[in-house]
Amino acid sequence: MEAKKIYAQALTDEAFAPFGSVVQQKDDVKMVSANGGTAKKYLKVSESIQNYEKSSSASTRKGVWNFFSTHPSVHPANDEHAAFQISVLERHPFTTQTFIPMCRSSDEQAYLIAVAPNAPDGMPDWNQTQAFVAKGAQGVTYSAGVWHAPMVTIGKETMLAAFNYENGVAEDDCQVQSTESPIEVFIKIST
């Protein structure tokens, strides 16, 4: 079956709001002086939420940090666009999940985000998939239950720090769905 084609857009607060929040330095966020005046602390740039009490499992949950060392999935060529096919989406039904890129320059295209809303049956609505390109200074927090592609990095190996809650029950922590009709995402390469 032929892949549906979509174009990735720049990651912005407004465009991503239905799926979560963008984690980045913002002028409209309250800032206070910290560390004896040697730092600026930007308050509440993103929330970590867990709803494991809605799970049928009685397992204890805990917040965990993980590192993802990802090999590039998108290899920009010398042309204007690069492409990547998405055939798998995952969600964390009871927790937000935050990714923060490390060791990428702030204005370089660092990774691709693909998200889909829930269909009426609770599975991903593949036809409504949207894609975003995040820069090196942008993290992202997926809301609990948001279908998203596994991490797709652009151009070079990238380390990402990730935070979410887990209770050790596979179906509670991560649900995965695949499709035989992949989504082909085109990414405009910035030079």
Swiss-Prot record:
Q: One GO term of the cellular component aspect?
A: cytosol
Q: Transit peptide: is it a keyword of this entry?
A: no
GO molecular function per UniProt: ureidoglycolate hydrolase activity; ureidoglycolate lyase activity
Which terms under GO biological process does the entry name? allantoin catabolic process; purine nucleobase catabolic process
Q: What pathway, per the record?
A: Nitrogen metabolism; (S)-allantoin degradation
Reaction(s) catalysed by this chain, per the record, are: (S)-ureidoglycolate = urea + glyoxylate
Pfam families attached here? Ureidogly_lyase
Q: Which UniProt keywords apply?
A: Lyase, Purine metabolism
Record EC number: 4.3.2.3
The kind of enzyme this is, by top-level EC class, is lyase
- On the tree of life, the source organism's domain of life is Eukaryota
Q: So what family is this one in?
A: Belongs to the ureidoglycolate lyase family.
Q: Report the protein's function.
A: Catalyzes the catabolism of the allantoin degradation intermediate (S)-ureidoglycolate, generating urea and glyoxylate. Involved in the utilization of allantoin as secondary nitrogen source when primary sources are limiting.
Q: How does it assemble?
A: Homodimer.
The identity of this protein, by name, is Ureidoglycolate lyase
